Amino acid sequence: IDPADVEKLLELMREQQFGKLVAHAPYTMNLCAAKEDIRKFSKEMIADDLRRMDYTPGNYYNFHPGSHVGQGADAGIEWIAEALNEVLTPEQTTTVLLETMAGKGSEVGRSFEELRAIIDRVELSDKLGICLDTCHVWDAGYDIAGDLDGVLEKFDHVIGLNRLCAVHFNDSMNDRGSHKDRHACIGEGKIGLDAMRRVATHPLL
């Protein structure tokens, strides 16, 4: 990375009053894979990405927690926390975001409780936040169309709204609780335009 390019970007962000950047990890990364070599590669990838992120201090790095591939969610949670304990550093300025997942296949992070369990096992948990994907939580079974207040209240009780740093704003092609993770254009899916509007304008978001 050319430091001169970084400085131009930072200057542009200041001039145009950018909000925080949200970088997204590669989808191939899986911190809780059954195979050790995949876990090792994933840890190296996130560590390298976090080093690069510090060129633009104070932003977000979002990733899918991973798929346990038959080991069970509890084992997956342990692997993810162990990896984060290895790669997070006290000096980093980037907040790492765990993304809410739809629960497709053996995905970890299909419930607020699973995400909380990861956070509780990470020593530098002050470096962690959450990215709430509207399609994913809908497909996971949370009724953001009919009871957005209730979903946010549950999120606050289990994780804490202080950790909610970003929202992936997507409609869903699927019925609530389908665990399929198929996004739709905003207003053209099962969540619907009115519900998406309520998400966009909710005072807690």
What are these regions (language model features)?
Residues 2-7, 39, 43-46, 77-82, ...:
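Charged helix-capping and loop-helix junction motifs
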Residues 28, 46-49, 130-132, 137-138, ...:
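Long, contiguous hydrophobic alpha-helical segments, chiefly transmembrane helices and signal peptides
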Residues 19-26, 30-33:
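Metal-cofactor-binding active-site regions of metalloenzymes
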Residues 26-28, 66-68, 99-105, 135-140, ...:
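Active-site beta-loop-alpha junctions enriched in small/polar residues
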Residues 2-22, 47-57, 85-92, 119-127, ...:
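Acidic (Asp/Glu)-rich catalytic clusters
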Residues 21-25, 61-63, 96-98, 128-133, ...:
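Hydrophobic faces of well-ordered beta-strands that scaffold small-molecule active sites
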Residues 108-116, 138-205:
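Gly/Pro-rich active-site loop or hairpin
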